[in-house]
């Protein structure tokens, strides 16, 4: 089994509803997402996936949808306020936890046809969540 991994950095803000810790308040992270791709064999170029292809697909999506945006739960009253102000917001069906954002990145990678096997999202250098498909 072969694997390659691409790291992408981005910034986002969020808060968690129905949560009694400090993360219930709006705050931000300098995140790092690590996307691992696997394949039993290499393509005609001798690669699992070209790093440039990952960058073109996933980094472009992150830059367009998540970077420097608030990521909020669909029923968060703050989402409506920010949207009415013309501020960029990305809305999830659930709380925007590191676990949910890792799963989102896994799904987006799959939608782009990449052979993703694992996504890890670091909120901080000492706190991360991983989704394995």
Segments (PLM) and residue ranges:
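Charge-rich, low-complexity N-terminal segments
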Residues: 1-133
């Amino acid at each position: 089994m072969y694997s390659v991994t691409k790291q992408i950095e981005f910034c986002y803000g969020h808060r968690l509803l129905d949560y009694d810790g400090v993360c219930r308040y709006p705050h931000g992270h300098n995140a790092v997402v690590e996307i691992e791709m696997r394949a039993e064999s290499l393509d005609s170029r001798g690669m699992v996936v070209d790093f440039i292809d990952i960058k073109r697909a996933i980094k472009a999506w992150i830059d367009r949808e998540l970077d420097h945006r608030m990521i909020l739960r669909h029923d968060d009253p703050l989402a409506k306020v920010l949207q009415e102000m013309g501020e960029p917001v990305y809305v999830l069906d659930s709380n925007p936890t590191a676990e949910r954002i890792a799963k989102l990145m896994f799904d987006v990678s799959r939608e782009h046809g990449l052979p993703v096997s694992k996504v890890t999202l670091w909120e901080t250098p000492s706190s991360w969540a991983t989704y394995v498909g």
